[in-house]
């Protein structure tokens, strides 16, 4: 199932809203969209987030042309505009971590 940009940002907004409502910390995983980067950069403090290496390494549609189904993952690899914004976040210390996304499946 493809997770759209709208799904990603609406879920991220919901997490932040719940954390603020209950005055709790939250760490948001697998950020992949420029909308999430922009939103989360305005909600630092109790909210931290990660970007995964694969989303900093390849971008769509090139990755699907070159790698086929090996590039399929969830959340999906997005286009270069999202890739560029993720790198902007890394270069400007906006994100808090780069997560391994380590999930071995047999």
Identify the meaning behind each predicted range.
Residues 1-98:
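Histidine/acidic residue-rich metal-binding segments in metalloenzymes
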